[in-house]
Curated annotation (Swiss-Prot):
Family classification: Belongs to the cysteine-rich repeat secretory protein family.
Alphabetically ordered keywords of this record: Repeat, Secreted, Signal
Entry keyword Magnesium: no
Gene Ontology, cellular component aspect: extracellular region
Keyword GTP-binding assigned: no
InterPro entries: CRR_secretory_protein (IPR050581), GNK2 (IPR002902), GNK2_sf (IPR038408)
TM stretches of this protein: none
Protein name according to UniProt: Putative cysteine-rich repeat secretory protein 23
């Protein structure tokens, strides 16, 4: 997919280190086109930098190692005088090993791209990693977003395709942000689905980070889905990602479909 508009805003993250992640039990599927492609990053320069070998650097490295070891749960750690917040969100169909691998890749990747920045965000197919030392409200981070869309337009009835794409994504939004979708149950704040398009199929997913409430997940998804027409109308595939929620749709199977 070719990238399009990138929106940036430097509102930033809490004084604790937390991992919010989701690993769901999923059914096996065939012909799954699954990658861990690098997507985008932001270096949050207003948060300043730190020196290699400093206490901050040691605390951050130790925290990343702790998160990797404790990948199945939430982690809260103070970092002495240098409060650090780390949020890792893996895609809902990620296994523990896939999530751990994505954390390693993301930390290495953002360390190269944002050398010694205290504030940085990086997106991959399988995870998003946020590192910061400043308190934030999740709504303030909504402008930290970007989108991709397929350069190819759909053939045939584009209006019908757009309507079916919108209907499927909003259906998944309702499923992901349902009050019945309580914490500690599979597929919390995450949903996948498919829709028949004649001889083809449309596949889609939506997800919120698990530091959001169900109500705020619904708000976040409504906000980014409102960008769907401008983002992706008539396109064979598209995705819109923020630090708190995202959606994606394609005409090929890119995600393991969740069981009902």
């Amino acid at each position: 997919m070719s990238s399009s508009f990138v929106y940036k805003s430097l509102f930033l993250v809490p004084i604790l280190a937390v991992v919010a992640m989701q690993l769901s039990f999923v059914q096996s599927v065939l012909s799954l086109n699954q990658t861990n492609e690098y997507l985008h990053h932001l270096c949050l320069n207003r948060q300043g930098t730190y020196e290699s070998g400093s206490k901050y650097a040691r605390d951050l490295n130790n925290l990343i190692q702790m998160i990797s070891i404790s990948i199945l749960g939430d982690v809260v750690v103070f970092s002495g005088d240098n409060s650090i917040y780390v949020k890792l969100q893996c895609r809902g169909d990620s296994s523990t090993s896939t999530c751990r691998s994505c954390l390693d890749t993301a930390f290495s990747g953002v360390s190269r791209r944002c050398l010694n920045n205290k504030g940085r965000i990086i997106w991959y197919d399988n995870c998003v990693l946020t590192i910061s030392n400043i308190s934030y409200v999740w709504r303030d981070r909504l402008p930290e977003q970007f989108l991709y869309f397929n350069a190819k337009d759909v053939s045939g009835d584009a209006k019908s395709f757009n309507e079916k794409t919108r209907t499927l994504l909003y259906k998944l939004k309702e499923k992901a942000s349902s009050k019945e979708n309580i914490p500690n149950k599979k597929n919390y704040l995450y949903a996948t689905g498919e829709e028949s398009l004649g001889k083809m199929k449309l596949y889609a997913m939506v997800q919120c980070t698990q530091d959001l409430s169900i109500k705020n997940c619904n708000v976040c998804l409504n906000w980014i889905l409102g960008k769907l027409p401008k983002c992706c109308n008539d396109k064979q595939g598209g995705r819109f990602l923020s630090t708190s929620c995202n959606f994606r749709y394609e005409l090929y199977l890119f995600v393991k479909l969740t069981t009902i």
